[in-house]
UniProtKB/Swiss-Prot annotation:
The protein's annotated pathway: One-carbon metabolism; formaldehyde degradation; formate from formaldehyde (H(4)MPT route): step 2/5
Listed GO CC annotations: cytoplasm
Reactions catalysed according to its record: 5,10-methylenetetrahydromethanopterin + NAD(+) = 5,10-methenyl-5,6,7,8-tetrahydromethanopterin + NADH; 5,10-methylenetetrahydromethanopterin + NADP(+) = 5,10-methenyl-5,6,7,8-tetrahydromethanopterin + NADPH
Protein name: NAD(P)-dependent methylenetetrahydromethanopterin dehydrogenase
Record note on quaternary structure: Homohexamer.
Molecular-function GO terms, alphabetical: oxidoreductase activity
Top-level taxonomic group: Bacteria
Biophysicochemical property: pH dependence: Optimum pH is 6.0.
Gene: mtdB
Main localisation: cytoplasm
Length: 297
């Protein structure tokens, strides 16, 4: 059997050691990082990877796409797919900054909690997402909308930037995502007034919602925070929290390590799917979400 090779592409200066470790621990034998990769480089790199091996060894060859930009990663996936010349085809898996698997795990954990605690699901729920301009928020918003929720991005620097992001989501996925201002405490409280679910995907170590702020969310069922660095992004959610009652007594909280556990397993199993598949796979956050739901239970 041919050796398993993973070509790891990133537009950044360095490939993430996190992703390198995950791929090796999942079983890939040879990893080659390519840094500073531009969108225009993807076709030539992809075709070099496919034409240097026999067609039957395409399933032993993978292209991983990293970086920190969800839309650029998706565009790179599209370029790689278009560069294939059947039967010369490889696996492709995108997970920029771990956001595809983190966002998938976050929404999967919320879905699990909604079912376990409230006998409901994401459909029709209003999901308000802080850190709205970030990659994890992007993925969570798209997954939520695709699952039938009403997702809203909150911009820490105003409404304009998140509105543009929401517009590109509609263009790319055909979904409607809301956008609101979250610059001041009163704006953040107004944003969560009708929230069934609150997600915090803001910067590490930054408090976004206080216990007092949560009083403005009388309908709140589940809140999740992926910030693992004190202070918590959402007050009262410990990093290890799994369906822990929130300080207001309204709803339950899910912490960063609970989400991280599902994220870790999801990313590991995505790599293993590539190694075990008999046909080439193209994997993104939608595939990650299906797997994360299975893992979360």
């Amino acid at each position: 059997m041919a050796r398993s090779i993973l070509h790891m592409l990133t537009p950044l200066k360095h490939m993430s050691p996190f992703d390198v470790n995950m791929a090796i621990d999942a079983g890939f034998e040879t990893l080659i990082p390519y840094t500073g990769v531009d969108l225009t480089d993807v076709v030539s790199l992809t075709q070099d990877s496919i034409f240097s091996r026999a067609p039957q060894d395409g399933v032993r060859t993978g292209i991983f796409i990293g970086g920190k930009n969800a839309e650029l990663a998706l565009d790179m996936v599209d370029r790689a797919k278009k560069a294939f010349v059947p039967p010369f085809v490889n696996h492709v898996f995108a997970d920029p900054a771990g956001s595809f698997t983190t966002g998938a795990a976050m929404v999967a954990e919320v879905n699990r909690a909604l079912k376990a605690r409230f006998s409901t699901d994401l459909k029709g729920k209003r999901i308000v997402i802080f850190g709205g301009a970030g990659v994890v928020a992007y993925v969570a918003a798209v997954i939520g909308a695709l699952e039938g929720a009403q997702t809203v991005l909150v911009g820490h620097d105003g409404e304009e930037r998140v509105s543009k992001i929401a517009f590109t989501m509609k263009w790319r996925f055909g979904i409607d995502v809301g956008a609101v201002d979250g610059t001041l405490p009163e704006a953040r409280r107004a944003a969560i007034t009708d929230a069934d679910v609150i997600l915090s995907a803001g910067p590490a170590g930054v408090s976004i919602l206080t216990a007092e702020d949560l009083e403005s969310a009388p309908k709140l069922l589940v809140a999740s925070d992926v910030n693992a660095v004190p202070p918590a992004g959402i007050a009262g959610i410990d990093v290890n929290a799994v369906d822990v009652p929130l300080p207001t007594g309204k709803g339950v909280g899910i912490g960063a390590l609970a989400v991280g556990n599902v994220k870790y397993q999801t990313q590991c199993r995505m790599f293993r799917k590539m190694l075990e598949a008999q046909e080439p796979l193209c994997l993104d956050f939608r595939d990650a979400y299906k797997l994360a739901v299975e893992i979360a239970g």
